[in-house]
């Protein structure tokens, strides 16, 4: 995955959909983690060096005016993201989206620190969904889509007894960080965001997934500045405390440039992978990012990024993206006992995968599905009518 202007020096750990990592990939990742952990401390103390590198000639883009540096620890990012999505996205979509703190504490077998270590103040807080307010919260989001009043929406979202208890143990800075994180999610519904979040049940590993879809035309090299990702570095201890394999490790990557694992959450974490992506991630600060269009994007087209060569198994053999389905590769590649794809008569010439042609084919496929469903419905109605007429006779 080319992450924030880096070349192929990033190992992605986790899953977004169909995330079946190969053994070789896991072993390589483990080697990278052990080889890089000695340099984590030095990397953290080099804040000025990292900051200047972001503004230099390393391939990073300029900072966005929308997203200040979050400054959240991994634990804070997990807690803030869980609560923000439960207040904003879950009521709107009608189901619970992915959460980081899915249980009170990782199983004992997954912990690798000694009994003498004291981390009680850093233990992750188990996520508890806000119940009984879903319709009320959804109305708040619908009102925000009309008036776009951030402060008013935040006040309505955080009203109630639960909020008083929640903020009781938070200092002013923690309250500010949480508020800014909620604002990031609210801005997804702004008129000028240029995208929307919709349910997505395409992928086998997700029952209640989501996708990001463009609502306006984006030109090549445009930045989708409100489609924000938030990053927090993970120490080895934090990895053991916060992550559970196959459960909440959907947005974790390992940076060989910074020699540490990084947690990646926020609205951009809902971007799905495609082997022919139309966007890429670009930096907007030390620990934030947005996406940049690689080609023209039409309204209604899903926004996608490339996760990496081995994210869905060896050579992405388990990938379920649209491109793999169209090409007959990844999870759609013919297996033993299944019919092989029709051979190409003349492989010297072929139609290039242009955006317009692919969009036209997709629209034709969608219209064909709709006509088929309408045909089935009309036939069913006709059969029912005929049956009634026969019965009346």
From Swiss-Prot:
Residues 367-378 have a biased composition (Low complexity). SUPFAM superfamilies: SET domain. It is found in: Nucleus; Chromosome. Its main location: nucleus. Signal peptide: none annotated. Residues 24-33, 53-66, 379-393 have a biased composition (Polar residues). Residues 35-51 have a biased composition (Basic and acidic residues). It catalyses: N(6)-methyl-L-lysyl(20)-[histone H4] + S-adenosyl-L-methionine = N(6),N(6)-dimethyl-L-lysyl(20)-[histone H4] + S-adenosyl-L-homocysteine + H(+); N(6),N(6)-dimethyl-L-lysyl(20)-[histone H4] + S-adenosyl-L-methionine = N(6),N(6),N(6)-trimethyl-L-lysyl(20)-[histone H4] + S-adenosyl-L-homocysteine + H(+); L-lysyl(20)-[histone H4] + S-adenosyl-L-methionine = N(6)-methyl-L-lysyl(20)-[histone H4] + S-adenosyl-L-homocysteine + H(+). S-adenosyl-L-methionine binds at residues 98, 203-206, 210, 257, 272-273, 320. GO terms for biological process: DNA repair; methylation; muscle organ development; positive regulation of double-strand break repair via nonhomologous end joining; positive regulation of isotype switching. Keywords: Chromatin regulator, Chromosome, Metal-binding, Methyltransferase, Myogenesis, Nucleus, Repressor, S-adenosyl-L-methionine, Transcription, Transcription regulation, Transferase, Zinc. Residues 13-66, 103-126, 360-393 are annotated as: Disordered. It is an enzyme of class 2 (transferase). Its EC number is 2.1.1.362, 2.1.1.361. Zn(2+) binds at residues 275, 319, 321, 324. The keyword Zinc applies. Residues 193-308 form the SET domain. Belongs to the class V-like SAM-binding methyltransferase superfamily. Histone-lysine methyltransferase family. Suvar4-20 subfamily. PANTHER family: HISTONE-LYSINE N-METHYLTRANSFERASE KMT5B, SUPPRESSOR OF VARIEGATION 4-20-RELATED. Histone methyltransferase that specifically methylates monomethylated 'Lys-20' (H4K20me1) and dimethylated 'Lys-20' (H4K20me2) of histone H4 to produce respectively dimethylated 'Lys-20' (H4K20me2) and trimethylated 'Lys-20' (H4K20me3) and thus regulates transcription and maintenance of genome integrity. In vitro also methylates unmodified 'Lys-20' (H4K20me0) of histone H4 and nucleosomes. H4 'Lys-20' trimethylation represents a specific tag for epigenetic transcriptional repression. Homodimer. Interacts with HP1 proteins CBX1, CBX3 and CBX5. Interacts with RB1 family proteins RB1, RBL1 and RBL2. Interacts (via C-terminus) with FRG1. This is Histone-lysine N-methyltransferase KMT5B. It comes from Bos taurus.
């Amino acid at each position: 995955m080319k992450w924030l202007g880096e070349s192929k020096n990033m190992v992605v750990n986790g899953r977004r959909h169909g995330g079946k990592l190969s053994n070789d990939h896991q072993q390589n990742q483990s080697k990278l983690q052990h080889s890089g952990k000695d340099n984590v401390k030095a990397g953290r103390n080099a804040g000025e060096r990292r900051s200047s590198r972001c503004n230099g000639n390393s391939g990073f883009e300029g900072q966005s005016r929308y997203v200040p540096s979050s400054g959240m620890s991994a634990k804070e990012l997990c807690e803030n993201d869980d609560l923000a999505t439960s207040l904003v996205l879950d009521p709107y979509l009608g189901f619970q989206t992915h959460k980081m703190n899915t249980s009170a504490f990782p199983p004992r077998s997954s912990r690798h620190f000694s009994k003498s270590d004291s981390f009680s103040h850093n233990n992750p807080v188990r996520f508890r969904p806000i119940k009984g307010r879903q319709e009320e919260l959804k109305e708040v989001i619908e009102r925000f889509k009309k008036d776009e009043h951030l402060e008013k929406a935040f006040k309505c979202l955080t009203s109630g007894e639960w909020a008083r208890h929640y903020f009781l143990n938070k200092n002013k800075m923690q309250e500010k960080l949480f508020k800014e994180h909620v604002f990031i999610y609210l801005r997804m519904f702004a008129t000028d965001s240029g995208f929307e979040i919709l349910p997505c049940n395409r992928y086998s590993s997700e029952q209640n997934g989501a996708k990001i879809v463009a609502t306006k035309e984006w030109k090549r090299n445009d930045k989708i500045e409100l489609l924000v990702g938030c990053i927090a570095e993970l120490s080895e201890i934090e990895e053991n405390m916060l992550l559970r394999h196959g459960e909440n490790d959907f947005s974790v990557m390992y940076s060989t440039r910074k020699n540490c694992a990084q947690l990646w959450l926020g609205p951009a974490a809902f971007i799905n992978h495609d082997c022919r992506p139309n966007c890429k991630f670009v930096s907007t600060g030390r620990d934030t990012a947005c996406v940049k269009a690689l080609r023209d994007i039409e309204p209604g087209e899903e926004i996608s990024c490339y996760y990496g060569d081995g994210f869905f198994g060896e050579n992405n053999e388990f990938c379920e993206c649209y491109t793999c389905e169209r090409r007959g590769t990844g999870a759609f590649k013919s297996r033993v006992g299944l019919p092989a794809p029709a051979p190409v008569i003349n492989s010297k010439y072929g139609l290039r995968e242009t955006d317009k042609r692919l969009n036209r084919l997709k629209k034709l496929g969608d219209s064909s599905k709709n006509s088929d469903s309408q045909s089935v419905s009309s036939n069913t109605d006709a059969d029912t009518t005929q049956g009634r007429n026969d019965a009346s006779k």
